Each structure stands twice: as C-alpha cells, then as structure tokens.
Amino acid sequence: MMMMSGRPSGGAGGGRYPFTASQWQELEHQALIYKYMASGTPIPSDLILPLRRSFLLDSALATSPSLAFPPQPSLGWGCFGMGFGRKAEDPEPGRCRRTDGKKWRCSKEAYPDSKYCEKHMHRGKNRSRKPVEMSLATPPPPSSSATSAASNSSAGVAPTTTTTSSPAPSYSRPAPHDAAPYQALYGGPYAAATARTPAAAAYHAQVSPFHLHIDTTHPHPPPSYYSMDHKEYAYGHATKEVHGEHAFFSDGTEREHHHAAAGHGQWQFKQLGMEPKQSTTPLFPGAGYGHTAASPYAIDLSKEDDDEKERRQQQQQQQQHCFLLGADLRLEKPAGHDHAAAAQKPLRHFFDEWPHEKNSKGSWMGLEGETQLSMSIPMAANDLPITTTSRYHNDE
C-alpha cells in the first residue's frame, strides 16, 4: 500500500535510501498507522485524512494531468496532511507515555483505554493521605462502682462510697445513722424516710437533729448535700425571712431533749423565744462584766438605766472576745447605739445551758472547751435585732 507522489529517478538514488523525501515521509506515515492497528487503539483522523487526499490527488493526476497541482517537495506531508501548529502524534501509540520531561520514556505497554501503564496511571493524583476510616464513637460502658451506686440508690439503700473516674478526691457519703443530723438540717430523702418508719422515729428522738454533734470525722456537712438533687435545701442554714421556718431550732416539744442532752456536752440548738431566762450567774464571771441579776444569755435593756448601759457598752467595746475555732477574735462594736430603739426591742437570748462536765463526750477536736453556739433567724412578723453574745466559761 505504498503510494508514490513522484516517480523515482534512476540518477537520484545517491541518497541514503532509494526513496525521495516525500516517498520516505509517506512510508513513515503508513508505518505509524500500522502501529495503531497492531496495538488495537483507534487511529486518529489526522492520519487517515492525508491518505484520502493523496488517493484523490493521484487518481486525478492519472485521469487529467491538467488538474495536478505543482509539486511542493520542501513542505511535504507536514503542511498537506497534518498542518502547522498541530501536536505531533505519538510515534509509539501502544507504549506508556510517562516521561521524565527530557528523553526518558517508560518502556511498559500502556493500559487498555489509557495513555499510561498500570504503574503510572495514578501517579498524578495525591496519594499521600490515607483514606480516613469513619468509626462510630461508642460511649464507654459505665464503671462497676457507678453502676452499683445507681442500683443501690434506686433500691433505697444508701451507698457507702461512690468513686468517680476524675482525678478529684472522692467523697464518701455517710451512713443513714451518721447523716441523720445533716438530713434534718439540710433536708434530703433520709429525713422523709425517718419520719415514716417508727423505729427510725425512735432513733430520731434519741439523736435529735437539733442536738448537733460536732465531731472531727464530720466537721462540715458532706458535699453530697450541696448537690443539684438537694438544691432547694442548700440554703437551709442561711437567713430566710419565712414565717414559721426554723432551720436550726426546735419547737416547744423539743425542750426535754435539750435538757437531757445538756449533761452530755452536746451543742444544742433551740428556738429562741421572747421569754427571759432567770439566772443568777453573771454574764462574765471572770472579768466582772454585767449585772449579777441580769440574764447570762440576754441583756434586757428595758430594765437598766442609762449609766449601766453606757458602762456596759464601753467595757464590751474594749474587752469583749469571742473564742471561735481555736482563735481569739476581738469583736469591735460601734460606740453609738440607738437606746430608744433598743429599749423597745428586747434582745433574744442566744445560748442555752452550758455543759459543766470536764470529760464531756461532745468536745470538739479533742479540746476540753465547753463553748456553745446558737443562731437565730428573724421572723417576717417581728423585726428584732440579732446580737451575738459570747463569753468564756471557766469551770471550777
């Protein structure tokens, strides 16, 4: 299938081949088409079109030489078939076209329907990142201690210890018999459960919530009573002006427990009434403060004259002390008072009977002190001043 655009001259065979330049270019064109056919790839139309034109030209020259164009041996097939500015066709269509940009080319066969071999097909894509495996995050199973604590709380049994996974120190919730005073003061499920059962009510009468045992093991209420479950009870110890609400003090029926527990060195909390308490014990026996006929726990300003009140205020301003938590704190009181307003509003006594035993079981932090503490909450009906009175008690 070799077509000659010109006739070979016998004297022109002085070149390297016995073909002219146009004949040699046509042979290369046909050989390239044969390579496409052998590799099974489709032949580009740019290679087939020059063959058709050359065939028509040769047939026209054979029939009518007048229609022949003048020969252009300098341009050849490059200008006639492929034209200028076109990209040169692949000389080896079945070979991988991967090169290094200069002279080297891959020697492997191209993958079917691709320009590159199997090795160089995906070389241009970014393969540095591995595919991310989307794993569903499952929550970790609850610990055995938390599960047991939840089951005990649902069954109505108080858990002894609840250990958390956080590095914070774990707190231990006290047993029901240890938590009875705190539950009565700060509220909670044990207070309601104790009121329903008769056995617990008997023990509740024995360990009254208003006789607060100060012990080194539980110097403060446990942190669990300040949790979100008992948020409505967290302010039971604060000053609430709600009529009839006594967080720290008992009603009139608890006076017997107060007198029974006075001999055991317990700290007692009672409802502060308006009745004066008659006693011949002076307010400050060691320093000689106060009047001997006055109440040791309250100062009735309506029964004293102006001279005694002025002298008492000066002495208390200079020498009144409060022994609280092992520290000697001096309480400074303002020099001026409204005597008329104070005379109309008698003070409410703060302290109950002091324990007079040396070896008392209610000693706090191993000390032999017999200090008592009592607090009052003002009612909504009356507007009474709250005054803290403290003294040293030297048992002889």
Curated annotation (Swiss-Prot):
Keywords: Activator, Nucleus, Transcription, Transcription regulation. Its main location: nucleus. Highly expressed in the intercalary meristem of the internode and in the shoot apex. Detected in the leaf primordia and emerging leaves in the uppermost node. Preferentially localized in the epidermis and in the tissues surrounding vascular bundles of the intercalary meristem of the internode and in adventitious roots of the second highest node. Low expression in the coleoptile and in the youngest leaf. Residues 117-176 are annotated as: Disordered. Residues 120-129 have a biased composition (Basic residues). Induction: By gibberellic acid (GA3) and submergence. PROSITE patterns: QLQ, WRC. It comes from the Eukaryota. One of its GO terms (biological process) is DNA-templated transcription. SMART domains: QLQ. It is found in: Nucleus. Residues 18-53 form the QLQ domain. A motif (Bipartite nuclear localization signal) lies at residues 86-105, 123-130. Residues 144-174 have a biased composition (Low complexity). GO terms for molecular function: ATP binding. Residues 90-134 form the WRC domain. One of its GO terms (cellular component) is nucleus. Transcription activator that plays a regulatory role in gibberellin-induced stem elongation. The QLQ domain and WRC domain may be involved in protein-protein interaction and DNA-binding, respectively. Belongs to the GRF family. This is Growth-regulating factor 1. It comes from Oryza sativa subsp. indica. The gene is GRF1.
